Amino acid sequence: MAKGQSLQDPFLNALRRERVPVSIYLVNGIKLQGQIESFDQFVILLKNTVSQMVYKHAISTVVPSRPVSHHSNNAGGGASNNYHHGSNAQGSTAQQDSEETE
C-alpha cells in the first residue's frame, strides 16, 4: 500500500499546497472541479462553492489546470518520465491538444 501512495501522495499534496484548480473525472463520467482541500488514504476533499468528499475508488482521473512539480524528492529523476506533467514546457500544451481532439 505504501508503494502505491508514494506516487499519489506527493502529487495530491502539491496540488493542495499550490491550490491548483483541478478537474476530477469519476468512473461514471461525471466531472468535478475545484481545489483539493485535503486528502487521506480513502477520500479527497474537493472545495469549490461547497466542499465535497470524493471517495478515491470512484475517481478515474485527476487533471490539474497547469503543470505541477511533484518530484522534488526524486533524486534519480527516472520515475518522472512516466508523467505527462513531468516536463513543465510541454505538459499543458499536450493536455490541451488532447482535449481539443475529443
UniProtKB/Swiss-Prot annotation:
Highest taxon listed in the record's lineage: Bacteria
Residue intervals passing through the bilayer: none
Boundaries of every Sm domain copy: 9-68
Alphabetized UniProt keyword annotations: RNA-binding, Stress response, Virulence
InterPro entries referenced in this protein's UniProt entry, alphabetically: Hfq (IPR005001), LSM_dom_sf (IPR010920), Sm (IPR047575)
Keyword RNA-binding: yes
A GO biological-process term: regulation of translation, ncRNA-mediated
PROSITE patterns: SM
GO cellular component, one term: cytosol
Compositional bias of kind Low complexity: 70-88
Pfam families in alphabetical order: Hfq (PF17209)
Family stated for the protein in its record: Belongs to the Hfq family.
PANTHER family (UniProt xref): RNA-BINDING PROTEIN HFQ
Self-association and partners: Homohexamer.
Protein name: RNA-binding protein Hfq
Native species: Salmonella typhimurium (strain LT2 / SGSC1412 / ATCC 700720)
Native organism taxonomy: Bacteria, Pseudomonadati, Pseudomonadota, Gammaproteobacteria, Enterobacterales
